[in-house]
Amino acid sequence: MKKELLAGTKGLVTTLMVAMVVVCIFQLFSAIGNFANRNNYVLSHSVFVIAIITWILYRYSIKNYLKKCPIKIALYCPIIAISILVLLSVFGTYIYIPNLFENAVTSIAQNALLCTITLGLLQPIAEEMLFRGVVLGCLLKGKTNPWIAIGISTFIFSIIHLNLTQMISAAIFGMIAGWLFYKTRSLWPSIIIHTTNNLSCCVWSFTSLSTITYGMTKEQLLIIHILLVIICIVVLSLTIKRITSVH
């Protein structure tokens, strides 16, 4: 397992370093060309993500992981993502967890198009290629216990987010994404789940929660939240059971 873990870690570090060098070059040209503006952070993030995708496709043999997966599993993935997102949103209403990078995320979310492309599409693809394709892929190639491999890749995936709010959701999504990758040996299920989650968050960032809950009492909100939790747990249980029977 040590050999596979070393290979996965090396792939992770190398990929991130290459992406950071590309971003530094981009920032240098931006400074020379006086290109600094409010979208500079967003563009830098986009360059970073694109560099990760390009480097992984060039350096690592993950094309086999981009093979087709069963249609039924692909259709179940958005249901899983939305159910988990709703559960996290409900619990987040009652448990305050500080977000250290809220301003950075807000700056991206101010531009709907860039938010959708960068956070909603490119970033999920890059992260799944890196953490499931490279890290988990290396671990599973050896004799590592699948759940230990999934746990290690999920832990690294969570830590890399660097703030408690995202670490919790990343851990939950990471375990499910890792399990789907292990079952199908395809990145598409985890990419679909990750993309659905991020796109939903982008849409949610442009929606005012106060307009949805306007006029509701605390008791009414509590009842709605309890019903949502029950529904989501039932849906998740049935969906995971269906996926297990499919593949």
What role is predicted for each listed range?
Residues M1-P70, I82, V86, L199-H247:
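N-terminal, membrane-interfacial amphipathic/helix-forming hydrophobic leader that caps
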Residues G33-I50, N111-T118, N145-S153, S186-P189, ...:
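Membrane-interface starts of transmembrane alpha-helices
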Residues F35-R38, I62-M129, G137-K141, G215:
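Juxtamembrane helix-loop-helix connectors linking adjacent transmembrane helices
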